[in-house]
Amino acid sequence: DYEFLKIIHCLKATGMQIKDIRKFILLVIQGDKTIDARLKLFQNQKNEVEKQIQQLEEALDTIKFKCWYYETAKVVGNTEFVDSIPDEELPEDLRVIRQKIRSLG
């Protein structure tokens, strides 16, 4: 049915491997005795998606910072000036991101 196909599409879209989607389908076919196994499968996938979201949010923060960085550099004509801006003069969100980026290097 359509709802079942949407669930499979959702699992695929979240990066679940085909073998695990196949496992889910087989569990559904086996009926209610596999409810616990299906729940575990979805809980595991939820955890994986939450990790992916966290990683994407961190990447997006870096991209936002670099957009600001190059927009500012374009206005002033160089990156040296932007690099010299003290952290305390940056808006808090940019300051936090800059500090995270610098702590990675």
Task: Describe the role of every protein-language-model region.
Residues 1-105:
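Arg/Lys-rich, alpha-helical DNA-contact motif
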